[in-house]
């Protein structure tokens, strides 16, 4: 039975995977850690992607995971993709995260002065408003609203590379990671909450030709809108 490593999104914690875990067949060894600085995980001075990957890998090794399926939601999918490029995995499941910086990067960079001041929360609230949370079932919506602890140090820390590095550089790295994952024989499955653009699909398949793409309607939280379906995808 496949080992599973489940990584939550920015500001959230391991509880956001509970509905998916409840749908998994027994027998899987599952690790759903809190990302550094989230939940009960210690805060850090830096949340660079490479550091976060190694912290998670240490947890996975300690739990005895062997070539796990690594599933990540949102920022967790960025971590999952980076993880799979440097550590053995059987498959990556990316839940609703495009790997191109695009307009999101522009919005983050423009928001930096506000993020560093007393009104930082307005930036996060504006982003939440576009995530389709209101369309989720009641229990899922409650989970999204409670299994979260936004802080400016988390936002600035995890977005530091978007803030400080050229988008082209970040995107070239993402493409290289996809090619490495493909060369290693690991699968890549993108679960998106909305119909993807042809431009992005072309980019994804240029670097991960065998990538599977599944649309699971549910705004930014398809794993909470339809946990049974996403559990089936993760379990393979």
Show the residue positions of the predicted features.
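Conserved HGGG/HGGXW glycine-rich cap/lid loop of the alpha/beta-hydrolase fold
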Residues: 1-42
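Active-site loop->helix "elbow" adjoining a glycine-rich segment at hydrolase catalytic centers
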Residues: 12, 74-77
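Active-site loop/oxyanion-hole signature of alpha/beta-hydrolase fold enzymes
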Residues: 22, 31-71, 75, 232
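Hydrolases whose catalytic domains are alpha/beta-hydrolase-1, hotdog thioesterase
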Residues: 79-83
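Flexible "cap/lid" loop of the alpha/beta hydrolase fold
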Residues: 85, 89-124
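Conserved alpha/beta-hydrolase catalytic His-Asp/Glu region
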Residues: 103-105, 121-181
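Conserved serine/cysteine hydrolase catalytic core
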Residues: 152-210, 214-217, 223
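Post-His helix in hydrolase/transferase enzymes
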Residues: 224-235
């Amino acid at each position: 039975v496949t080992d599973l490593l489940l990584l939550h999104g920015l500001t959230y914690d391991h509880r956001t995977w509970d509905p998916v875990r409840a749908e998994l067949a027994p027998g899987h060894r599952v690790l759903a850690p809190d990302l550094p600085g989230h939940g009960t995980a210690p805060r850090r001075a830096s949340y660079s992607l490479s550091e976060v990957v190694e912290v998670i890998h240490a947890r996975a090794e300690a739990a005895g995971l062997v070539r796990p399926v690594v599933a990540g939601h949102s920022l967790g999918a960025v971590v999952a993709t980076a993880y799979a490029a440097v550590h053995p995995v059987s498959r990556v499941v990316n839940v609703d995260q495009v790997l191109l910086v695009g307009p999101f990067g522009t919005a983050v960079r423009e928001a930096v002065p506000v993020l560093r001041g007393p009104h930082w929360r307005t930036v996060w609230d504006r982003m939440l408003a576009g995530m389709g949370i209101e369309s989720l079932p009641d229990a899922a919506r409650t989970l999204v609203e409670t299994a979260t602890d936004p802080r400016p140090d988390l936002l600035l820390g995890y977005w530091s590379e978007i803030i400080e590095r050229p988008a082209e550089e970040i995107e070239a790295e993402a493409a290289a990671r996809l090619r490495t994952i493909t060369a290693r024989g690991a699968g890549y499955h993108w679960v998106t909450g909305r119909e993807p653009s042809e431009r992005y699909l072309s980019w994804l398949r240029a670097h991960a030709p065998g990538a599977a793409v599944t649309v699971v309607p549910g705004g930014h939280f398809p794993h909470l809108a339809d946990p049974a379906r996403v559990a089936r995808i993760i379990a393979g």
